[in-house]
Amino acid sequence: VLILGKGLGVGILSAALKKGELSDAGYAEMIATTTQLNRVGADLAELPAVHAITDVTGFGLLGHTLEICRGSKLTANLRASALPVLPQALAWAQAGYGPGAIERNWASYGQDVDVSADVAEWQKRLALDPQTSGGLLVACAPEAVDEVLALFKAQGFGLAAVVGEMSDGAARVVLSA
């Protein structure tokens, strides 16, 4: 099972900020998430049913998930509808905002990602969005999901969510609706 500890959208909020269009609330949300430390990772690493942990940063969720796939020789199945989004970033994402790194990320590793036709373009871009101090992506056994989510929530990661699972197959990421 794949669990993401923070909401996505930091790069999108940064793009809105650079255009001078980000609200005070959006700025506050961006600062709050980028300054929230991922100390929870030390506790997660102690759990025997946690198999992998990585932080989602410049290559976005899809790129860092692909790293796990390559290391494990498995396929990751992500659900776009389950991806946590920073509330202030949602409208910007839907409006197509984002940094140029979104396109560069896709050019770098898109050949190893399958995106279902029912995934909205903004959802794909959100999964490619580079994060500054992004959330931890945790791969764990199904029986550990409740414990992993409880650890995240207890340490203030209110947007932590199950975003997908690993399966047998080639080292690829599949993003479906």
Outline where the language-model segments fall:
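Helix-biased detector of long, well-ordered alpha-helical tracts
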Residues: 1-177
